[in-house]
């Protein structure tokens, strides 16, 4: 197996005023070659796409108040405003119906059905308290991560690119990737979260 080297690229804090491809090109000048795979955090991609909101801009529905009570742990969907934020994109009734379907599927031993039917339920990041000025924001999943990855690869001339959702709980998922990339292999490489979950730039 070829030796791998993970090289974090330091940037300033990116905002909705930035273009993600332009920013990556700016901060990787002279660092990326034809054999390199470039990975970018999904939350940063989403922020540059203006896909975020603040809790005070949301009005929680009764569906959100009910459903969050059945979500275990401290994930985004256990938060009232995290749940409502996902509903803003998926639809309140769709989320509720899919939640019921997922609950029934779970009784028969099939987990994760709700998250597969309502993708924003798994992609929405609740308020984290980190990375100002977005420390008080709820960040949605990115739009067209496959397209973003292809644009990055084309602009930089690298081996490949991907948009990944990684955290410090040993969970890693590749949401978008350029042609020729095997997402499961990349997810395994990123499992130790080189992006970081605090205020890393």
Regions found by a protein language model. Name each.
Residues 1-201:
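N-terminal and secondary-structure boundary signal
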């Amino acid at each position: 197996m070829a030796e791998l080297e993970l090289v974090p690229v330091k940037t300033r804090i990116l905002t909705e005023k930035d273009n993600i491809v332009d920013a990556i090109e700016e901060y990787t000048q002279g660092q990326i070659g034809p054999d390199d795979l470039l990975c970018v955090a999904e939350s940063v991609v989403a922020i540059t796409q203006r896909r975020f909101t603040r809790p005070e801009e949301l009005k929680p529905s009764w569906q959100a108040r009910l459903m969050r009570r059945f979500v275990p742990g401290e994930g985004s969907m256990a938060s009232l405003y995290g749940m409502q934020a996902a509903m803003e994109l998926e639809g309140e009734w769709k989320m509720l119906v899919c939640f019921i379907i997922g609950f029934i599927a779970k009784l028969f031993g099939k987990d994760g059905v709700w998250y597969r039917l309502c993708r924003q339920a798994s992609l929405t990041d609740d308020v984290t308290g980190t990375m100002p000025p977005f420390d008080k924001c709820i960040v949605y999943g990115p739009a067209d991560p496959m397209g973003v990855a292809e644009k990055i690869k084309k602009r930089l001339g690298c081996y490949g690119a991907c948009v990944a959702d990684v955290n410090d709980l040993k969970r890693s998922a590749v949401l978008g990737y350029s042609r020729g990339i095997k997402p499961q292999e990349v997810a395994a490489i990123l499992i130790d979260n080189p992006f970081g979950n605090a205020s890393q730039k």
